[in-house]
């Protein structure tokens, strides 16, 4: 009899705990988030490639593009402006210094993959980079043809040119090296341009050292490290977000939610959004997570339907050409 009573008491305690956790993380009891989702156009408008074939940090992705249906190249003025016109609320660009002290938009460590040049980007002068054809190395058939050759001559822009092309829309600057001096160089360009980078909401990400440095310079702007900081926040929240306590790793940080891993996010969406807003953190929804691969953005329009209607954070997008207009319908 006593044993039976103890079992009932234990069961009652479990039920109360489960009920408490349910209410604590109940999204329907949280306030409705204000605002709409914001699209981050990764690389602006660019040539999508076969992600399964082109893997690895140093893989030449230009060798694996899908048959091209446009002549717009990543990290160019046309790419940035078109991405904004298609609905990109923020356009992601890659920055790299030149041999003669300038700073340009270019993704790769060397120019060998995409262009008709050779060598590291940092070992070339601005005039040498401007002379290159950035469409030279693109092929969709394993090198049998190069349909974009001659289409990208002189299109590598300086950061100053990019700022002038996007005076009213925020940019997300990606540091491509671990050198914190590049943060100083970029910040000096922003200051000299007269751009109101704080009001516009420009943001920065990349390796830890340049991110830490830009935080010291642009103290009111969003800066983050995707590999360590965002990963820690996301993992920590999944582990003990059920308590209602937001991990310290998320404070003023970034929580990344793969489209296929929304289910372990406690209080998703409304309660989670309120918690992150309470500690100054941003949320980024990205494309499907695949084990052993880095996160990519959304490229399938149908994935938009998997995001809760009340979500008001950021969505990382690969194919802004398709995703942008679809979200605005």
List the predicted regions and their residue ranges.
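Phosphate-group recognition and catalysis centered on beta-loop-alpha active-site segments
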Residues: 2-329
């Amino acid at each position: 009899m006593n044993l039976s009573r103890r079992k009932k008491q234990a069961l009652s305690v479990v039920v109360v705990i489960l009920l408490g956790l349910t209410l604590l993380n109940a999204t329907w009891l949280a306030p409705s988030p204000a605002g709409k989702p914001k699209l981050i156009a990764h690389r602006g408008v660019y040539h999508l490639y076969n992600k399964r074939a082109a893997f690895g940090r140093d893989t030449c992705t230009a060798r694996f593009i899908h048959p091209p249906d446009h002549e717009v190249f990543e990290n160019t003025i046309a790419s940035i402006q078109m991405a904004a016109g298609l609905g990109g609320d923020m356009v992601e660009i890659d920055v790299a210094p030149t041999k003669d002290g300038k700073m340009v938009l270019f993704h790769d460590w060397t120019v060998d993959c995409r262009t008709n040049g050779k060598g590291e980007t940092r070992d070339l002068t601005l005039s040498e980079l401007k002379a290159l054809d950035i469409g030279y190395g693109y092929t969709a058939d394993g090198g049998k043809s190069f349909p974009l050759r001659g289409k990208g001559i002189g299109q590598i822009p300086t950061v100053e040119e990019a700022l002038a092309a996007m005076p009213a829309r925020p940019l997300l600057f990606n540091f491509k090296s671990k050198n914190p001096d590049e943060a100083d160089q970029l910040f000096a360009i922003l200051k000299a341009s007269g751009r109101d980078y704080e009001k516009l909401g420009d943001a920065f990400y990349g390796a830890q050292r340049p991110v830490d440095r830009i935080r010291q310079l642009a103290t009111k702007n969003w800066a983050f490290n995707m590999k360590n900081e965002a990963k820690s926040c996301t993992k920590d929240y999944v582990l003990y977000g059920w308590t209602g306590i937001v991990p310290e790793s998320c404070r003023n940080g970034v929580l990344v939610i793969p489209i296929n891993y929304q289910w372990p996010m406690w209080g998703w969406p409304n309660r989670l959004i309120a918690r992150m807003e309470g500690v100054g953190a941003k949320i980024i929804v990205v494309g499907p997570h695949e084990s052993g691969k880095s996160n990519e953005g959304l490229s399938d329009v149908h994935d938009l339907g998997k995001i809760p209607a009340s979500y008001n954070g950021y969505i990382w997008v690969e194919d802004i050409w398709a995703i942008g207009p679809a979200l605005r319908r």
